[in-house]
């Protein structure tokens, strides 16, 4: 049956008013109908899904090592497979075949929307969460390229697959809390739902463009436009006019630089820059945008300037105001090779001779905000969601109040929880085996693995609640590395491994949960979702590691920005941040930086501050229950206004806030019909057009060395923004005070 006609035929369920989803954004976008007769796991779905998965993981792994990395989202394949699927529906034979008593057809009918969703689930496995590749590849890259460690391919495969499958196990256990409840609505999925409907549903004639025509127009415009910031006029990514007005002022450039400063007055006209770190602002709820904005303004425009110019906190003026580099006390780059033993441990004598490690002021304060964010998340979820979570724990799932989407999903068999327990037990067993067999390579003992699993189990639910309701994911990378850094000081590899099991398994779990909610909205049978996610995860993991291994073995001086090839396109900026984190938390260790006598010891108080701050908000919400805006004050999301900087810049976040405010406040409130019809379609079109042009520019021009060099290709014309201002500190291209 054609998906376009599904609403006219059998087994269509319509809601009554009391069944409608109480979340307005969901009610406006997600269809309240289903056709259970549509085939899902067809030959087309398997072929196109696995092809999309392999192609995306290859491209994303390849691009992530580039000096200008590019993440290609699943939206690219989501669009590309539609004409291919329809072509296969027209040309493949419709004959039924029997295999071991199982009847199937290569062509069961027209290409339908549920097949398309399953293909996208496969494709999402080829993108992984956020970075375009498995996070464990970051640890493997740091081990091989930065620490020059000899690591076996089998050990690397264990690391990649166990972290991914462990996350899937957490996701299965937490479905009843983060997928089934109505209030867990996962805002980012609405863009996907809107795009699927635009591609498959026939709209009644109405004023204005259909969603499909609007999507194609926006896609074409985005595709053409990205040639400007992506190649011809890159300065559009960081438009820092303050630096042009005061070309000789260090202070003005520190304040106004969009790339190396606070970004006051700077802006970006590059969609990739707007959506790079917090995702598309068009899919974030207005309350979330407002909370992030409050945190951003407090941090960038009040806290950082006061600490830098007023109090010189942490010897701030010795270093650039904004940098992810590590420094010596004299403001020079910190050379970690001088303090490493051949076993990749800290040489304490060499460290004492070489000197302490220092951070840029914004980097240090951003780490402190991570301390507050972790405890604030636990307190916030305990206070605002604890009672509901407790009730769901001790009551049968079937007694949970269901909206129309939950009722429609009752037509399908659920996935038994023991299927997920098997995956969880298998990944835990393989991880523990790895800690014994490759003990020297991973440095993390078996009890460290168990501790990482326990930490992931504790935090996945509260962080999932925040992401499912606000579209923001409070990270706790810093906390995991902080804890194990105290327990196992001087062991950077152990710190990396602990991070990917204790933190990144949570990231993967939340990615899988988001896809499960997408399947819930699109009425995909849960067992089909299970199969697609599991197979896609394993295939993507193997290809991901294979491509990364090939590149690490075949490209000379990959990730070496200070070697014989300073202009190499393979400088791995993303993995440089991972390496820096392993030095801060693993090699040097939190005791030396944040313990008694450490330069950054006072930041530890932010653990307590973060734990306390949600309490008055919760108390006010109980005292004034009619003030519906009080519970919308979300301390973890406010602290997320500082998250990701660096490598995110203030200009990235400020532009995200402005764009989100325009669409999810003004357009949503004053042009709701336009917002309902086009908002999420526009988000998908901007992502897709940018991705298509990014791939084209790379293969047609940049990979062939056809780079432009003129005024418009400079980053932001703020050469003095990275200069220190303390007396006697020397830096290249900077005056000495």
Swiss-Prot record:
Q: Which GO terms describe its cellular component?
A: cytosol; membrane; plasma membrane; plasmodesma
Asked if the Swiss-Prot or TrEMBL record annotates the protein with the keyword GTP-binding, the reply is no
Q: Which InterPro entries match?
A: Oligpept_transpt, OPT
Q: In which tissues is it expressed?
A: Strong expression in flowers, leaves and roots. Preferentially expressed in the vascular tissues of seedlings and mature plants as well as in pollen and developing embryos.
Predominant localisation class: membrane
Q: Which residues cross the membrane?
A: 45-65, 69-89, 117-137, 153-173, 215-235, 255-275, 289-309, 357-377, 418-438, 446-466, 478-498, 532-552, 604-624, 629-649, 650-670, 681-701
The terms under GO molecular function for this entry are: oligopeptide transmembrane transporter activity; transition metal ion transmembrane transporter activity
Any GO BP: protein transport
Q: Which domain of life is it from?
A: Eukaryota
Q: What induces it?
A: Highly induced by iron, copper and manganese deficiencies.
Query: Which controlled-vocabulary keywords does the entry list?
Result: Developmental protein, Membrane, Peptide transport, Protein transport, Transmembrane, Transmembrane helix, Transport
Record's subcellular location? Membrane
Q: Which Pfam families match?
A: OPT (PF03169)
User: How does the entry describe its membrane topology?
Assistant: Multi-pass membrane protein
What task does this protein carry out?
May be involved in the translocation of tetra- and pentapeptides across the cellular membrane in an energy-dependent manner. Also acts as a metal transporter that could be a component of the copper transport machinery. Essential for early embryo development.
Q: Which family does it belong to?
A: Belongs to the oligopeptide OPT transporter (TC 2.A.67.1) family.
Mind telling me what this protein is named?
Oligopeptide transporter 3
What gene, per UniProt, encodes this protein? OPT3
């Amino acid at each position: 049956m054609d998906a376009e006609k599904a609403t006219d035929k059998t087994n269509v369920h319509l809601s009554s008013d009391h069944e409608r989803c109480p979340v307005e954004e969901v009610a406006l976008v997600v269809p309240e109908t289903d056709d259970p007769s549509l085939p899902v796991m067809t030959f087309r779905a398997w072929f196109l899904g696995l092809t999309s998965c392999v192609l995306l993981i290859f491209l994303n792994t390849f691009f992530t090592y580039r000096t200008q990395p590019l993440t290609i989202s699943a939206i690219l394949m989501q669009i590309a497979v539609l004409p291919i699927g329809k072509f296969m529906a027209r040309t493949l034979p419709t004959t039924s075949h029997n295999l071991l008593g199982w009847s199937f057809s290569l062509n069961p009918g027209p290409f339908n929307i549920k097949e398309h969703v399953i293909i996208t689930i496969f494709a999402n496995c080829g993108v992984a969460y956020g970075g375009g590749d498995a996070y464990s590849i970051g640890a493997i890259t740091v081990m091989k390229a930065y620490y020059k460690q000899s690591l076996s391919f089998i050990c690397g495969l264990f690391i990649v697959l166990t972290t991914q499958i462990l996350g899937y196990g957490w996701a299965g256990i937490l479905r009843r809390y983060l997928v089934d409840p109505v209030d867990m609505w996962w805002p980012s999925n609405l863009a996907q739902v809107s795009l699927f409907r635009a591609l498959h549903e026939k709209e009644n004639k109405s004023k204005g463009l259909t969603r499909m025509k609007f999507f194609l127009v926006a896609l074409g415009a985005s595709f053409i436009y990205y040639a400007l910031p992506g190649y011809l006029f890159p300065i559009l990514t960081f438009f820092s006019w303050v630096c042009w007005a005061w070309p000789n002022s260090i202070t003005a450039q520190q304040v106004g630089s969009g790339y190396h400063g606070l970004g006051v007055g700077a802006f970006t006209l590059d969609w990739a820059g707007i959506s790079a770190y917090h995702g598309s602002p068009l899919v974030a709820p207005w309350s979330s945008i407002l909370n992030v904005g409050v945190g951003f303004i407090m941090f960038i425009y009040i806290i950082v300037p006061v600490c830098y110019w007023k109090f010189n906190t942490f010897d701030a003026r010795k270093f650039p105001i904004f940098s992810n580099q590590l420094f010596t006390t004299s403001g020079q780059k910190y050379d970690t090779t001088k303090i490493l033993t051949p076993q990749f441990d800290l040489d304490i004598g060499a460290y004492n001779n070489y000197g302490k490690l220092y951070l840029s002021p914004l980097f240090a304060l951003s780490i402190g905000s991570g301390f507050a964010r972790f405890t604030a998340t636990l307190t916030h979820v305990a206070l605002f969601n604890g009672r509901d979570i407790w009730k769901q724990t001790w009551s049968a799932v079937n007694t949970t109040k269901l909206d129309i989407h939950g009722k429609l999903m009752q037509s399908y068999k659920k996935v038994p929880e023991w299927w997920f327990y098997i995956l969880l037990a298998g990944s835990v067993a393989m991880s523990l085996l790895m800690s014994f067999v490759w003990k020297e390579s991973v440095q993390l003992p078996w009890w460290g693995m168990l501790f990482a699993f326990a930490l992931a189990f504790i935090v996945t639910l509260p962080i999932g609640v925040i992401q499912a309701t606000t579209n923001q994911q409070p990270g706790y990378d810093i906390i995991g590395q902080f804890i194990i850094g105290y327990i196992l000081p001087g062991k950077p590899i152990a710190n990396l491994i602990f991070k990917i099991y204790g933190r990144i398994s949570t990231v993967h779990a939340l990615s899988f949960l988001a896809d499960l909610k997408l399947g819930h909205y699109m009425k995909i049978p849960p067992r089909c979702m299970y199969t697609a996610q599991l197979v896609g995860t394993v295939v993507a993991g193997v290809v991901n590691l294979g491509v990364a291994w090939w590149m690490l073995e075949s490209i000379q001086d990959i990730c070496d920005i200070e070697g014989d090839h300073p202009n190499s396109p393979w400088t791995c900026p993303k993995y440089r941040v991972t390496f820096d984190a392993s030095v801060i938390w693993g090699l040097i260790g939190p005791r030396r930086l944040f313990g008694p006598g450490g330069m950054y010891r006072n930041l530890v108080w932010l653990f307590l501050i973060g734990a306390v701050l949600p309490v008055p908000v919760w108390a006010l919400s109980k005292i004034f229950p009619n003030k519906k805006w009080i519970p919308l004050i979300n301390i973890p999301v406010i602290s997320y206004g500082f998250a990701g900087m660096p490598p995110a810049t203030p200009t990235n976040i400020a532009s995200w806030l402005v764009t989100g405010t325009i669409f999810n406040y003004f357009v949503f409130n004053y042009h709701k019909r336009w917002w309902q019809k086009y908002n999420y379609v526009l988000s998908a079109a901007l992502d897709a057009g940018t991705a298509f042009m990014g791939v084209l520019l790379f293969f047609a021009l940049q990979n062939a060395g056809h780079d432009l060099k003129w005024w418009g290709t400079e980053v932001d014309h703020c050469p003095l923004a990275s200069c220190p201002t303390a007396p006697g500190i020397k830096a290249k291209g900077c005056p000495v005070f």
